[in-house]
């Protein structure tokens, strides 16, 4: 009778150990899958962060160029104003002197050239501003992607922690069950 009880207990113990082993294998597979996913997400996150840094540097560079172009634009406008003022003065004198007329004609040409330059600069400025706006938009999108990847990584880490805790609990339960059955077997 004692032998039968011991045999029954051993069979139960082996069954429990088999089940525990099978659960442990499942758990470890799930855990390593989650760890792999977390690692892949982390790598993707790093890449996205690098791209954001690069874009921020490009935006900064574009903004510097814009500032330079705006300064040039202001300088050209000032030159045009000077030219127009000089022309008006010449016209005001209403002199017939050929040298003055030549000077006025040259000034008019210069003013026309400057206006052309300003027009060209205006177009470039608008194009650069559009570019900067688009890049800032892309940056914001990238940052949103990074935040969602961050959240996904956090969720995976929480799942891993939960599974590890669950495994520990299962392990403790198994040990407790085995101890209980062994001590129970000794008394019967």
Curated annotation (Swiss-Prot):
This is Tuftelin. Signal peptide: none annotated. GO terms for molecular function: structural constituent of skin epidermis. Keywords: Biomineralization, Coiled coil, Secreted. Interacts with TFIP11. It is found in: Secreted. Belongs to the tuftelin family. It comes from the Eukaryota. GO terms for biological process: biomineral tissue development. Involved in the structural organization of the epidermis. Involved in the mineralization and structural organization of enamel. Its main location: secreted. GO terms for cellular component: extracellular region. The lineage of its organism: Eukaryota, Metazoa, Chordata, Craniata, Vertebrata. Residues 1-181 form a coiled coil. Transmembrane segments: none annotated.
């Amino acid at each position: 009778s004692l032998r039968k009880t011991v045999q029954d207990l051993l069979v139960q113990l082996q069954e429990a150990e088999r089940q525990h082993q099978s659960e442990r294998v499942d758990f470890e597979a799930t855990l390593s899958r989650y760890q792999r996913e977390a690692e892949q997400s982390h790598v993707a996150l790093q890449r996205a962060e690098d791209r954001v840094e690069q874009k921020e540097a490009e935006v900064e560079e574009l903004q510097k160029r814009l500032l330079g172009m705006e300064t040039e634009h202001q300088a050209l406008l000032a030159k045009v104003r000077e030219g127009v003022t000089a022309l008006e003065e010449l016209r005001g004198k209403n002199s017939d002197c050929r040298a003055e007329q030549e000077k006025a004609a040259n000034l008019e040409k210069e003013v026309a050239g400057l206006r052309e330059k300003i027009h060209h600069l205006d177009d470039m400025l608008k194009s650069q501003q559009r570019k900067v706006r688009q890049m800032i938009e892309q940056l914001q999108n990238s940052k949103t992607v990074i935040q969602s990847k961050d959240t996904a990584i956090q969720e995976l880490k929480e799942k891993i922690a939960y599974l590890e805790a669950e495994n520990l609990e299962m392990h403790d339960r198994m040990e407790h069950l085995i101890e209980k059955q062994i001590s129970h077997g000794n008394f019967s």
